[in-house]
C-alpha cells in the first residue's frame, strides 16, 4: 500500500491534468459540445492524433483568468488529498496568448490557484514554463524570454515539450541559454517518442538537470551510464508511456532497470486523466507493477525533492515533511 506515502510530482501538464468533472462543468458553462471527447466521466481518444485533438478540445473550455485559477486549485486539491506535498506544473504562456487571454493573465490565474490550494492544505507548487517544438525555435525563444523576464517567484523552470520529431535539440539551444542565464532550472522532453539519440542530443545541447521521460535511454547502455554519472534526473511517467504505446506493458517498461543502473528516477503522471491514471495510481504501480518497496519509493520521492526547482529553504522544509 502506498496511499499513506508522501508524494511529489515533477512532470504534469496543467491542461493535461484537467479533471473530467470540472471540464464537463466548464463545457456546460460555455455551451461547448464535448460529447465526442468526454463520455461517462472519462476522456475519449484512440491514437496519438486523437489524443492531441481531445487535449485541444478540453483546453477550449478554460478561457479566463478565473478558469485557470479554478483548474489549478482543483488539481492541487486532488494532489493534496493523496498526501502530495509538492507539485511542478508545466504551463505555456503561448497557450494563454493563443486563446486570447494573454500570457500574463493566464499565469496570474494559475498563480492564484496555487495560492488558494496552499492556503487550504499547505501544498507547495511551482511553474515550469514550456516552449513547444512544433511552433519552431523563435516561439520557444519567446517562451524562454517570457520566463526569464517575468520576475515571478513561482516560475522556477524552463522546459521544451511538443512533437519530439520536430528538429534537433540544438535548434532550440538558444532558448535554454536564455533560461539558464536567468537562473531557471532546465528540463526537457526527450526519449519518449524518439529513441536514445534524443536523450543524448538533450545532454549535448542543453545540459539539463532533468529530462522529462527519458526512458528510451535504456536502448543505449553507454548513455544510461552517462545519465548515472551526470546525475541527470528522469521524470518517469509509466502510465503515460503505456497509454501512448511507448511500451506495450509494464513488464517491458525500463523504470526498474534504469534505477538499478544508478540513474536518478522520479514518478509523475504527465496528463493523468487523459491516460486514465493519477499520481496516486503511479505510486501504486511503482509497488505493484515494478516491485518497489515503500523505502525505495520514498527514496524516489526524496530524489524528486532534491531535484525540484525550488530555493534551499523550501527544499529543506519539503525534506522535513517526508
From Swiss-Prot:
It catalyses: adenine + H2O + H(+) = hypoxanthine + NH4(+). Its cofactor is Zn(2+). It is an enzyme of class 3 (hydrolase). CDD domains: ADA. Zn(2+) binds at residues 11, 13, 189, 270. GO terms for molecular function: adenine deaminase activity; zinc ion binding. The record marks 213 as: Important for catalytic activity. The active site is at residue 192. Substrate binds at residue 271. The keyword Transmembrane helix does not apply. Binds 1 zinc ion per subunit. Its EC number is 3.5.4.2. Belongs to the metallo-dependent hydrolases superfamily. Adenosine and AMP deaminases family. Adenine deaminase type 2 subfamily. Catalyzes the hydrolytic deamination of adenine to hypoxanthine. Plays an important role in the purine salvage pathway and in nitrogen catabolism. This is Adenine deaminase. It comes from Rhizobium etli (strain CIAT 652).
